C-alpha cells in the first residue's frame, strides 16, 4: 500500500472513522432523469445533472427542473440497454465541469469528444482528435487554477466493454492549454474521474478497470511525473467517481458493487455505504479476477439507492451535503456528511457570480 503524503486541509483525525451512511436518512431530488452520471452543485443550491437524452438537467433549489438539450444532437431516448450502455449510441454527457464563465465542459462518452455547452444548449466541439487519432471514450474533464483543462479517456476500443473484458491499458490523460492538446499520461486501465489536491501538486485519477486510484506529480508546463498507486493496490471494486473532503480523505464510488468508500491520508480504506447485491457483486469480482467480465455479468450487479453508483458531489452551503450520481438511476440520492467537501475551483467563482 502506498503511504500518501498528506493532502489534508484540516489537521485532525478524520471524523469518517467509525461513521457510515444510515440508509434511512437518504433523501432524493429530481425525477425522470436519464443516466445522471455526473452532478455539479452551485452555492445557491442549484444542481446540474448530466442527462443521457443529450444535455443537462437543471434542478432549482425549489425542486423545479428543466432539461436543456445540446443544440448539435438529436434527442437520445428509448434506446435498449445494449445501445445505451454497451454501444453508447448518441450523445452521452458523462463528466461535467464549469468553465470560468459558468458554461459546461462536457466529456461526451457517446460522441467521443470534449464539448462546450452554454446554459441555453448551444454546443460546439473543442476536441475530437488528438495527435491525428480519434479521442476515444471521453470520460471526465476538470479545470485547474492555471486555466488548463484535463481530460480522461477510458479506452479507444469499440464497444468500450471489450476493454473491460480484456483489461486493456489504452486509457490516457490529456491536457488542453494555449499550446494545444496533448497526451501527458497513457497506458492506463479504464481512466475515469480525476481530481487535484488543494495545492494542485498531485493529480489523482480513478483507473476503474484496474480497481485502483493512481496519482501523478504535476510538473511545470502541465507535464506529469511517474504514476504511483494511492491507497490500496485494489480498492475493492470498480472505482468510478472520486472527490476529496476537507480532511484529505479521498471518497470513491465503486460502480456496480454500488459501494461508497474513502481512502484516508494514511492509506486506510473505509466503507461508508454498501448498497450492492452480495451474490452479484461476488460473481462480478470473480469474473474480474479471471478476466472474463461480460456486459451480462455487469448488468446483474447493481444496487437500489443509486443504481450503478458512478459519482459523488459535495454541495449545500456548508459543502456537507453529498449527492450521488448513477448510470441507471432516475433521481439523485443525497445525505449529510460529518465532513465538508474540498471546494472545487468553480465554487467561489459561482458564489461571486451570484452575488
What is the role of each PLM region?
Residues 30-44, 74-104, 131-157, 167-173, ...:
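Beta-rich, blade/repeat-based domains predominating
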Residues 2-25, 162-170:
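Blade/loop signatures of beta-propeller domains
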Residues 55-57, 113-115, 171-174, 212-214, ...:
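A short loop-to-beta-strand structural motif that recurs across blades of beta-propeller domains
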Amino acid at each position: 500500500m502506498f503511504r500518501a503524503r498528506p493532502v489534508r486541509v484540516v489537521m485532525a483525525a478524520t471524523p469518517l472513522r467509525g461513521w457510515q451512511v444510515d440508509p434511512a436518512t437518504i433523501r432524493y431530488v429530481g425525477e425522470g432523469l436519464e443516466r445522471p452520471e455526473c452532478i455539479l452543485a452551485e452555492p445557491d443550491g442549484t444542481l446540474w445533472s448530466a442527462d443521457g437524452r443529450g444535455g443537462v438537467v437543471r434542478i432549482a433549489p425549489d425542486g423545479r427542473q428543466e432539461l436543456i438539450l445540446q443544440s448539435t444532437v438529436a434527442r437520445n431516448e428509448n434506446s435498449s440497454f445494449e445501445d445505451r450502455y454497451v454501444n453508447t449510441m448518441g450523445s452521452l454527457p458523462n463528466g461535467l465541469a464549469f468553465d470560468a464563465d459558468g458554461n459546461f465542459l462536457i466529456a461526451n462518452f457517446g460522441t467521443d469528444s470534449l464539448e462546450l455547452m452554454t446554459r441555453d444548449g448551444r454546443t460546439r466541439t473543442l476536441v475530437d482528435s488528438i495527435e491525428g487519432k480519434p479521442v476515444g471514450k471521453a470520460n471526465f474533464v476538470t479545470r485547474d487554477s492555471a486555466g488548463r483543462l484535463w481530460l480522461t479517456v477510458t479506452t479507444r476500443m469499440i464497444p468500450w466493454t471489450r476493454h473491460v473484458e480484456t483489461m486493456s491499458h489504452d486509457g490516457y490523460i490529456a491536457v488542453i492549454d494555449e499550446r494545444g492538446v496533448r497526451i501527458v499520461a497513457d497506458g492506463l486501465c479504464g481512466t475515469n474521474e480525476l481530481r487535484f489536491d488543494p495545492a494542485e501538486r498531485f493529480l489523482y485519477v480513478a483507473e476503474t478497470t484496474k480497481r485502483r486510484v493512481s496519482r501523478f506529480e504535476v510538473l511545470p508546463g502541465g507535464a506529469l511525473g511517474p504514476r504511483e498507486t494511492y491507497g490500496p493496490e485494489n480498492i475493492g471494486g470498480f472505482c468510478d467517481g472520486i472527490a476529496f473532503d476537507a480532511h484529505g480523505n479521498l471518497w470513491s464510488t465503486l460502480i456496480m458493487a454500488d459501494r461508497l468508500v474513502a481512502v484516508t491520508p494514511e492509506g486506510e480504506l473505509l466503507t461508508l455505504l454498501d448498497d450492492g447485491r452480495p451474490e452479484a457483486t461476488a460473481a462480478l469480482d470473480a469474473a474480474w479476477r479471471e478476466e472474463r467480465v461480460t456486459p451480462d455479468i455487469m448488468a446483474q450487479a447493481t444496487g437500489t439507492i443509486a443504481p450503478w453508483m458512478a459519482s459523488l458531489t459535495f454541495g449545500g452551503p456548508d459543502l456537507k451535503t453529498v449527492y450521488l450520481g448513477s448510470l441507471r438511476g432516475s433521481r439523485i440520492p443525497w445525505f449529510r456528511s460529518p465532513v465538508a467537501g474540498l471546494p472545487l475551483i468553480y465554487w467561489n467563482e459561482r458564489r461571486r457570480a451570484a452575488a
